[in-house]
Amino acid sequence: MKMVVVIRNDLGMGKGKMVAQGGHAIIEAFLDAKRKNPRAVDEWLREGQKKVVVKVNSEKELIDIYNKARSEGLPCSIIRDAGHTQLEPGTLTAVAIGPEKDEKIDKITGHLKLL
């Protein structure tokens, strides 16, 4: 069981901004998973809440990953920045998928490089 966070690397976000966007994505995906499959969430919590952070280099890649996760019925989230600091309002910044079985997520994100 794991969660994968996908961050856009093409936006020039500072490290703190990337962490914040990833945090937003994690919370939203967790809430989605809690609704869809509470037993999977409980298992993930017991196993130590494994998270992996990877990167993409475009909005298109981010949207494609999100759409694949949704089409597979996986818990997921996509984050649009509010535009208060570094980015324009509505900029897509991050996706989180899971918690779910590793192999289900790897099917979608296994080719991506670690951030």
Curated annotation (Swiss-Prot):
It is an enzyme of class 3 (hydrolase). Its EC number is 3.1.1.29. It is found in: Cytoplasm. It holds the Pfam family PTH2. The natural substrate for this enzyme may be peptidyl-tRNAs which drop off the ribosome during protein synthesis. PANTHER family: PEPTIDYL-TRNA HYDROLASE 2, PEPTIDYL-TRNA HYDROLASE 2, MITOCHONDRIAL. It comes from Methanocaldococcus jannaschii (strain ATCC 43067 / DSM 2661 / JAL-1 / JCM 10045 / NBRC 100440) (Methanococcus jannaschii). One of its GO terms (molecular function) is peptidyl-tRNA hydrolase activity. The keyword Cytoplasm applies. The lineage of its organism: Archaea, Methanobacteriati, Methanobacteriota, Methanomada group, Methanococci. This is Peptidyl-tRNA hydrolase. Disulfide bonds: none annotated. One of its GO terms (biological process) is translation. Gene3D superfamilies: Bit1. Coiled coil: none annotated. GO terms for cellular component: cytosol. It catalyses: an N-acyl-L-alpha-aminoacyl-tRNA + H2O = an N-acyl-L-amino acid + a tRNA + H(+). Belongs to the PTH2 family. Keywords: Cytoplasm, Hydrolase. InterPro entries: Pep_tRNA_hydro_II_dom_sf (IPR023476), Pept_tRNA_hydro_arch (IPR034759), PTH2 (IPR002833). The gene is pth.
